[in-house]
Swiss-Prot record:
ATP binds at residues 83-90. This is Eukaryotic initiation factor 4A-1. The Q motif is unique to and characteristic of the DEAD box family of RNA helicases and controls ATP binding and hydrolysis. Residues 70-240 form the Helicase ATP-binding domain. The keyword rRNA-binding does not apply. It comes from Arabidopsis thaliana. Its EC number is 3.6.4.13.
C-alpha cells in the first residue's frame, strides 16, 4: 500500500498560486483580505476547554492557515480560505465551529459538507477530538450507512453534523435533521465537491437553511463555480490565501517501517540505533509528554539523547539547540513546534517516531531549503492506524515512500 505511487502530477507551487490569482483577478471588490496573524493558539481568545483539546490532539503551534483563519471564523465572519489540502484547514474550521457552539442547546448548530465519505468521517474525528473537553456531540451523515441509525442519532440531538451532500439533503427533507438552529455552514474541499457534480445539491441544502447563517468555504482552488457559490450565499466574505513555503524534499530518501502497533516503536528505534552509525539525527513525536517519555526510555537503555519541547523555557531550549548544532549532542527528540526552527542541514537522519498530524508538517520536519540541497534520509514509523496518513502524505507531495531496505546503513 504505502509504496504505491500517488495519483496526480508533480505539484508546482508557483503555478498553483499564479493560477489562483488569475482566477481571482477582478474579484477584489468582492473579497476583503484578512491579514491579522496570531502566532500561538493562546493568543486567539479561545475558550480554555477548546485549547485543552487542541493541545491534547498534538497541535502546538498553529500552521499558516490556522494563524490567519481561526479568529475571523470565531468572529462569525463569512470566510473563504484557500490553501492546499493538508495545511490544517480542518482544524481551522473545527476550532471556529467549536468556539461558537452553545453547548446547553443539544440541537444541530453547525453543518459541514465534504465531498467524500472518508473526508466527512475524518472531519468528524477531528471535531470530536478537539471538542473532547467541551462535550461536543458530532455525527457523520454519509451514504452507505443506515438511514434509520442516522435518524435515531439526530433525533437524540447533536451539536454538529458533518456529511456528504446526498445524505444530508435526505435528512433535511425528512426533517430528521432540523435546520432551525443551524448558524454555521461549512463547505470543505469546495472545488472537489463541485467537480463531483454536487452543485445542485449544495444549492438545495442552502435553501433549507435559515437565512442568517455564517458560511465558510475551504478550497484549494477557486474555480468559477466556486466563486458563484460564494457570491450567492456569502456576505462580505474575507479571503485568506496561504502561500507555500519554499522547501523541497528533493534529494531526501524517504522510507517507512511497518511497526504494526504503537508498542513496538521503541524496540524498532533501538534496533535502528544499534545497526546504524548515525552522525546526527532528529526524532519527531507528536506530544510534549511523549518527548519526555521517549527521552527517559532511550536514556534508560544507555542512548545519549537530548530533548526539547514547548513546555521548556526559551533559555533551556536555546542551550539544548546550541549543543545539538555544535555536535556535542547527537540525537534530538522534539515536536512539530520546533520543526521549523531546527537548522537540520547537518542532520543525516530524521525519524518520524510519530507521523505528523497534518501533511504540511511532514515537509517542515524533513524538507530542506533549496539553497543547501543537502542529502538526507527520513524514516517513518507506521502503525496500522497511520496507513491513511502515509497515503495522504505521498499524494500531497507526489512522492513514493518505500519500505526500509535491509541495507539502510549504506544510505547514511
Amino acid at each position: 500500500m504505502a509504496g504505491s505511487a500517488p495519483e496526480g502530477t508533480q505539484f508546482d507551487a508557483r503555478q498553483f498560486d499564479q493560477k489562483l490569482n488569475e482566477v481571482l483577478e477582478g474579484q477584489d471588490e468582492f473579497f476583503t483580505s484578512y491579514d491579522d496573524v496570531h502566532e500561538s493558539f493562546d493568543a486567539m481568545g479561545l475558550q480554555e476547554n477548546l485549547l485543552r483539546g487542541i493541545y491534547a490532539y498534538g497541535f502546538e503551534k498553529p500552521s499558516a492557515i490556522q494563524q490567519r483563519g481561526i479568529v475571523p471564523f470565531c468572529k462569525g465572519l463569512d470566510v473563504i480560505q484557500q490553501a492546499q489540502s493538508g495545511t490544517g484547514k480542518t482544524a481551522t474550521f473545527c476550532s471556529g465551529v467549536l468556539q461558537q457552539l452553545d453547548f446547553s442547546l443539544i440541537q444541530c448548530q453547525a453543518l459541514v459538507l465534504a465531498p467524500t465519505r472518508e473526508l466527512a468521517q475524518q472531519i468528524e474525528k477531528v471535531m470530536r477530538a478537539l471538542g473532547d473537553y467541551l462535550g461536543v456531540k458530532v455525527h457523520a451523515c454519509v451514504g452507505g450507512t443506515s438511514v434509520r441509525e442516522d435518524q435515531r442519532i439526530l433525533q437524540a440531538g447533536v451539536h454538529v453534523v458533518v456529511g456528504t451532500p446526498g445524505r444530508v439533503f435526505d435528512m433535511l427533507k425528512r426533517q430528521s435533521l432540523r435546520a432551525d438552529n443551524i448558524k454555521m455552514f461549512v463547505l470543505d474541499e469546495a472545488d472537489e465537491m463541485l467537480s463531483r457534480g454536487f452543485k445542485d445539491q449544495i444549492y438545495d441544502i442552502f435553501q433549507l437553511l435559515p437565512p442568517k447563517i455564517q458560511v465558510g468555504v475551504f478550497s484549494a482552488t477557486m474555480p468559477p463555480e466556486a466563486l458563484e457559490i460564494t457570491r450567492k450565499f456569502m456576505s462580505k466574505p474575507v479571503r485568506i490565501l496561504v502561500k507555500r513555503d519554499e522547501l523541497t524534499l528533493e534529494g531526501i530518501k524517504q522510507f517507512y517501517v511497518n511497526v504494526e502497533k504503537e508498542e513496538w516503536k521503541l524496540e524498532t528505534l533501538c534496533d535502528l540505533y544499534e545497526t546504524l552509525a548515525i552522525t546526527q539525527s532528529v526524532i519527531f513525536v507528536n506530544t510534549r509528554r511523549k518527548v519526555d517519555w521517549l527521552t527517559d526510555k532511550m536514556r534508560s537503555r544507555d542512548h545519549t539523547v537530548s530533548a526539547t519541547h514547548g513546555d521548556m523555557d526559551q533559555n533551556t531550549r536555546d542551550i539544548i539547540m546550541r549543543e545539538f548544532r555544535s555536535g556535542s549532542s547527537r540525537v534530538l527528540i522534539t515536536t512539530d513546534l520546533l520543526a521549523r526552527g531546527i537548522d537540520v542541514q547537518q542532520v543525516s537522519l530524521v525519524i518520524n517516531f510519530d507521523l505528523p498530524t497534518q501533511p504540511e508538517n511532514y515537509l517542515h520536519r524533513i524538507g530542506r531549503s533549496g539553497r543547501f540541497g543537502r542529502k538526507g534520509v527520513a524514516i517513518n514509523f507506521v502503525t496500522r492506524d497511520d496507513e491513511r496518513m502515509l497515503f495522504d502524505i505521498q499524494k500531497f507531495y507526489n512522492v513514493v515512500v518505500e519500505e526500509l531496505p535491509s541495507n539502510v546503513a549504506d544510505l547514511l
